[in-house]
Amino acid sequence: MTMDQDELLKVRDRYDAEMRRDAQPDGAHARVERTGRVVRQTVPGLGWNGVLWSDLDEDTADAEIAAQVAHFGARGEEDGGPEFEWKLYSHDRPADLGDRLRAAGFVPEAPETLVVARTADLAALPVEPPEGITLRVVTDEAGVDLMMEVHHRAFGTERPRIREQMLTLLRDEPDTIEAVLAMAGDVPVSAARMEMRPGSAFAGLWGGGTAPQWRGRGIYRLLVAHRARVAAARNIPYLQVDASADSRPILERLGFGVLGVTTPYIWRGTRP
């Protein structure tokens, strides 16, 4: 059952506090710090670098943007380079923060819809694998490479940062990730993962890309239900997704409710 608007607003407040303002690092080598009026993550190598949360107004926004550009811009290539993301949420302030980021040289990527659902509701979904499909939990590099193969077939792109992040989590913090493949015999046709942080009320669902010839058969739904059952066994109350335009309708039919819209603003070291 989808949450009503009052409950969604309460969950959004909890999400902002727990996953943004008081965020935990997303890996053993990452560092989250509050500096000035923002919370940011910095990590060497191919990890995710960026601004998670901000408390800005018309008088403070431009100076804080400049401070973050200076911080990340000072990083050498050996540290991962200057590129970073300012993850903007539709309820962030000031209202023109996106315009200010663009004026500072950030490039917006496609927006996604932040959706959330109760884990218990999704764990109870009556889902059976489509004929010919089995699930395989990923625990090693060979499995991660199969996931990257699926991603390339589904989207036509390579994701070296995601590969490195998954390998690091599986090696250093295996309890924080659940990665799974949908297999047609020996061929991977879909892949997804769930990331969890100790003590967090939210588990994040990522991936779910499916090879074109296998779409529309319920595999995405199957992968959501599998991860929900894992999260339920760990007493994590909510599942969260940054949903693309393609996945949002599926997720809403499963009972996810909308918390807002997120837009990644990317700084690549120079103005466009």
Regions found by a protein language model. Give the residues of each.
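Conserved active-site tyrosine of GNAT-family acetyltransferases
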Residues: L101, L251, F256
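Conserved beta-hairpin
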Residues: R31-T35, R93-V107, I177-A192
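A conserved beta-turn-beta hairpin within the catalytic core of GNAT-like acetyltransferases
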Residues: T42-L52, E109, M196-L205, R215
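A conserved beta-strand-loop-helix scaffold within acyl/acetyltransferase catalytic domains
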Residues: E158-Q213
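Short amphipathic alpha-helix that is part of the acyltransferase structural core
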Residues: M1-R21, L52-L56, E112-L114, D121-L169, ...
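Conserved acetyl-CoA-binding loop-helix of GNAT-fold acetyltransferases
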Residues: A61-V69, G207-P212, G216-R229, A233, ...
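N-terminal charged segments
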Residues: M1-D79, R93-P94
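Acyl-donor-binding surface of acyltransferase catalytic domains
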Residues: D59-A142, V241, T263-W267
